[in-house]
């Protein structure tokens, strides 16, 4: 599947880089993750096998189908939504969570603003 310019998509495919990123974030079995724009799920694969709970927020419906077919549904959820319109309490009502993502450059500032707005949960 090709990246869609209108979503500012870029896909991480370098296996070594994905392994290095996973190592740097030090995933633990108690972690709860919110991944912004999981894309085809290459980074996702390194998270969901090791964390307690995972949610991926993907705005592209075509990629959502890819993700749902690639990963089992137990304790993992993929939501078709614009991250900027998401209230994190909808998915993590009581818990703090970690945010990760290969975010599109064209909305990186608004995403950082969203993170700042919801800092108590992150």
Where are these regions (language model features)?
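Catalytic cores of RNA-modifying enzymes
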Residues: 1-122
């Amino acid at each position: 599947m090709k990246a869609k310019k209108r979503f500012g998509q870029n896909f991480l495919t370098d296996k070594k880089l994905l392994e290095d990123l996973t190592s740097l974030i030090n995933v633990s079995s108690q972690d709860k993750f919110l991944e912004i724009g999981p894309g085809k799920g290459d980074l996702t694969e390194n998270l969901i096998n090791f964390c307690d709970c995972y949610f991926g927020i993907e705005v592209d419906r075509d990629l959502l189908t890819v993700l749902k077919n690639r990963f089992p549904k137990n304790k993992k959820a993929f939501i078709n939504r614009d991250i900027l319109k998401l209230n994190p309490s909808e998915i993590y009502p009581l818990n703090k969570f970690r945010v990760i993502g290969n975010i599109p450059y064209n909305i990186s500032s608004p995403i950082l603003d969203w993170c700042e707005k919801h800092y108590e949960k992150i």
